[in-house]
Amino acid sequence: MSELKIKAAKAAIAYIEDDMVIGVGTGSTVNFFIKELAAIKHKIEACVASSKATEALLRAEGIPVIDLNSVQDLPIYVDGADEVNERGEMIKGGGGALTREKIVANVATQFICIVDESKVVKRLGEFPVAVEVVPMARSFVARQIVKLGGDPEYREGFVTDNGNIILDVFNLNFSTPMALEDSLNVIPGVVENGVFAKRLADKVLVASASGVNNLK
């Protein structure tokens, strides 16, 4: 599986141009992308990290990291996904960085999703949806999610970079992913959720034994 993740990471490097500021996501496939990026770090201007973990990895490779607030234009954002379909709709946030990932993705002109073939699905929903919640609202949000048909589980001992907690939600209805994304976000106490149906991936680079294909 690592070999496929490396393939996908290498394929994304082809989209990096000189003097670019690059948005960098979070997760195991992105970690391989950071290694590949380190080899051309002299060509790029800097990176915007979607998590403290990613920032630490970038800095460890000697890659400059800048704050999103100092950026007006972000040409490209590279990130993985827990699930992705052929339309570029995704479930993300298994690592808990979904809020910052969604923010950086929305700033970026182009979102390149890098995955191995196991992450490609016809219909989203096997993987649970991470929902970032203000701690005091945990029980209330969980009750509201149950009303939506979901089964929330508290991610014990996990605190997001924003100081919040995560509810992992199973068995949600993905017949209309965009409506689901909205339905979760309007619950008071919800910061963000891991359904990416509004900000789609512009390119989905899928690595398999036979090579890397662009799903979109």
Swiss-Prot record:
Superkingdom of origin: Bacteria
Keyword Kinase annotated: no
EC number: 5.3.1.6
Any one Gene Ontology cellular component term annotated for this protein: cytosol
Any GO BP: pentose-phosphate shunt, non-oxidative branch
Functional pathway: Carbohydrate degradation; pentose phosphate pathway; D-ribose 5-phosphate from D-ribulose 5-phosphate (non-oxidative stage): step 1/1
GO molecular function, one term: ribose-5-phosphate isomerase activity
Catalytic activity: aldehydo-D-ribose 5-phosphate = D-ribulose 5-phosphate
Matches recorded under Pfam families: Rib_5-P_isom_A
Catalytic machinery residues: 101
UniProt keyword list: Isomerase
Alphabetical list of InterPro entries matching this protein: NagB/RpiA_transferase-like, Ribose5P_isomerase_typA_subgr, Ribose5P_isomerase_type_A
Residues reported in the UniProt entry to bind substrate: 26-29, 79-82, 92-95, 119
Chain segments annotated as coiled-coil in the UniProt record: none
The protein's role, per its UniProt record: Catalyzes the reversible conversion of ribose-5-phosphate to ribulose 5-phosphate.
NCBIfam families in alphabetical order: PRK00702.1, rpiA
Annotated family: Belongs to the ribose 5-phosphate isomerase family.
Quaternary assembly: Homodimer.
Alphabetized PANTHER family for the sequence: RIBOSE-5-PHOSPHATE ISOMERASE (PTHR11934:SF0)
Protein name: Ribose-5-phosphate isomerase A
Organism whose genome encodes this protein: Legionella pneumophila (strain Paris)
Biological classification of the source: Bacteria, Pseudomonadati, Pseudomonadota, Gammaproteobacteria, Legionellales
